[in-house]
UniProtKB/Swiss-Prot annotation:
Homodimer. The lineage of its organism: Eukaryota, Metazoa, Chordata, Craniata, Vertebrata. It is found in: Cytoplasm. The modification Phosphoserine is found at S21, S80, S106, S159, S198, S212, S223. It is linked to Triosephosphate isomerase deficiency: An autosomal recessive multisystem disorder characterized by congenital hemolytic anemia, progressive neuromuscular dysfunction, susceptibility to bacterial infection, and cardiomyopathy. Its main location: cytoplasm. The modification N6-methyllysine is found at K194. Its EC number is 5.3.1.1, 4.2.3.3. The modification N6-succinyllysine is found at K149, K156, K194. Pfam families: TIM. This is Triosephosphate isomerase. GO terms for cellular component: cytosol; extracellular exosome; extracellular space; nucleus. GO terms for molecular function: methylglyoxal synthase activity; protein homodimerization activity; triose-phosphate isomerase activity; ubiquitin protein ligase binding. Substrate binds at N12, K14.
Amino acid sequence: MAPSRKFFVGGNWKMNGRKQSLGELIGTLNAAKVPADTEVVCAPPTAYIDFARQKLDPKIAVAAQNCYKVTNGAFTGEISPGMIKDCGATWVVLGHSERRHVFGESDELIGQKVAHALAEGLGVIACIGEKLDEREAGITEKVVFEQTKVIADNVKDWSKVVLAYEPVWAIGTGKTATPQQAQEVHEKLRGWLKSNVSDAVAQSTRIIYGGSVTGATCKELASQPDVDGFLVGGASLKPEFVDIINAKQ
């Protein structure tokens, strides 16, 4: 990892927790040692963004798990970047595979959301990744490059973007990409950024890995030169999240 890329660990709590259990988790995180050279962001369910921001130590940032592409309006069930910021959160996760595959969000919609969230001043954790049949068909590169292009077309300032590579076949399945598999895709993604955006953006943009990251797998993954951190699902609800935060130590 280049010295200019600050290690980034995101915890995606998905649709989990209640005030009591999340309060206990937050207590554990607040007591944990967070290395100065590591950025930590937690993404609680929408209903608990305010709660999490009030309870979490300021050293840990808060993200929303999704947002819509406009400021206000007749969009029942949606939230806007302005609302997210109003609750004290500074990041949003966009394009997560569950949004793409469970809720049918298209590349185009995700691109529009990325553009609006950035314009409104949020940091964006933009997710990309191939499904198992796509990996087995040998089209991993094609899929992730297409997804990345739609995101890149909507980004003016890359300093507010973290790219999260999440092989869909490794999310919540207990299967993890090997450190070598993760490094290979991350390296290719950095090459794509160099060719299609700029060398400076390729060098400075953090590319993080998501997909069944645990306390046991994080250290070897973190040692790969192009793995700049993690987006953690299930393990972010457990005390081992602290081990993942300290994966570079």
